[in-house]
């Protein structure tokens, strides 16, 4: 949960979706890992964590699921977010960084794929609009957000994780560990 978890918590926390309680399902599949010296060392980290949370949005309790998975077949450092309402939803994944999926309830339930390219980035990127954006462009976005936030020029855009958000993630993960150990939901607020 630790190093991966903050990535999954950043957006919900920034939106004000703070978990009130959590029930955690933690998986420890590998007990050893390579030690970098040709041998094996004990592995004391959780491989996968699914945190079933409840948060308040507009005065109503709604479910919030935060998932971090070291073991995720066919994924390579993939991060995604999916926000679903009764009539609309949106989905984004770093696996398809130029694509946003939008759900709308019409006569049928429809997911539409929008190819937004990388021209909609908060800050200009090195790569031209007709080319595939890469790691250097993503890294540049992070540095630009840090610099803009530091100079007070970020405006309405998301900045870097705050110390308060880091503390909240640690509180959530501590409650998740207790939830797993006690096999019950743990209150946070």
Residue ranges of each PLM-predicted region?
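Contiguous beta-strand/loop segments that form the cofactor/metal-binding neighborhood of enzyme cores
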Residues: 3-105, 138-153, 174-175, 188
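C-terminal helical cap and adjacent loop that interface with cofactors, partners, or active-site loops
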Residues: 74, 81, 107-189
